[in-house]
């Protein structure tokens, strides 16, 4: 019989009074029990720290990096840097990434239960076509880039052509971009939260893509200030010949903002020529257009 069984049998045979006394004696010999258990408060959930804003290069690299998936990361990074330095869509990339940064927390919270998370790459999948940015499959050939094997056996990224292409987009803001992405298939739960965010003027990011002003186009097409001044007059105008002697008028000056006639580069000779046109009663039908062009004001009538 084990010692435990013997103790139990001995206690069972004791009279009730002795049994209670024995139990009290045993309890007195035991060390005191621990005090009340201290309740540890549960950690208070804290708001997530604001995430770093996504800039244009981060979006560019995320979207086009797969073009060089056959290379290790060490080789891909220089290629991406070279492409970014010559990329013509910096404004578009900055805009797309700014919109994403402003609504990223909403997209993550509202779509937490979705299997397909709205990551930066997923967002760009819909935003890039809307903005008219070149897709992955057309980017390198459209901009004249090619991977060339060098004599030493290494592969380098080289630009073998400089093709021309036109960007033709309408002015757009963040809400317009988000709406067009939805039309293209982007699915967002409880989208009204995102719409409210992008509708707030204090958080809106406006991106303009207006066509060049006709005077800017003219300035870009000529480096001759004399030719620019001569273009202000009809071919047979009496003062047209005088324009050949005015060489101090720079076309970019007339595109600057400020008080007319007070900026550096202002020509009194040019003011005299304009005054002559205004006082000439035999103005041709082209003079109103030429004056509007010179003063950079809209045509009336």
Curated annotation (Swiss-Prot):
DNA-binding feature ranges: 49-104
First-listed, main subcellular location of the protein, grouped into a coarse class: nucleus
Cellular component, GO, one term: nucleus
GO BP: any one term: positive regulation of mating-type specific transcription, DNA-templated
Subcellular location field: Nucleus
Transmembrane portions of the chain: none
Family: Belongs to the MATALPHA1 family.
Described purpose of this protein according to its UniProt entry: Mating type proteins are sequence specific DNA-binding proteins that act as master switches in fungal differentiation by controlling gene expression in a cell type-specific fashion. Transcriptional activator that induces the transcription of alpha-specific genes.
Identification of the protein by name: Mating type protein mtA-1
Species per Swiss-Prot/TrEMBL record: Sordaria fimicola
